[in-house]
């Protein structure tokens, strides 16, 4: 049985009071982001005041190599699975996932890693059904800052640039989706590293209405792509 509930010390540092005086910045509200170097930090997303759990991990070299090799082939990839996990001991059936790339170095390690993430996600939430999507993207799928209308979503980028997000107060939530309202100061835009694992709490998490994590897809540079995996709680 997987467990993510070992003690965690949040790494966030309070923002200076002068930060609130920046033009266009609205006052902070009672939400924070939990960031750490072990998977246990992901469990902090269960706390009411947390809308992001971010595990700042470094991918094993063979898994990182797999992602880079896959992207180098310049082939399309868009796969979805609905995975049933009837009990805590059930293992996700990832047979066939990215099977067209199974001859690449690191494929088995990638599958093992994805399987662990599914199991950990299900264990943390008590989920019996998990939706998995694996995609190669050459452009920003959701280029404007927005919130997800789901309870919680796991996202990790195996190769390429990672997702971007905002701390509370960096943008007026009433203007989400409007390009003119997005932060102009690049220091206000946070970037998730390749290989890191994030849990984004959305608007449909009980008690989190109006506080879903604000984020967007990054725009890859011309000729660049990204390999991204997402998990959703289906039941």
What are these model-derived regions, one by one?
Residues 183-235:
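Catalytic core of Fe(II)/2-oxoglutarate
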Residues 39, 140-143, 213-216:
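Glycine-rich, charged/polar anion/phosphate-binding loops
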Residues 114, 134-136, 156-168, 217, ...:
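Active-site environment of non-heme Fe oxygenases that use a 2-His-1-carboxylate facial triad
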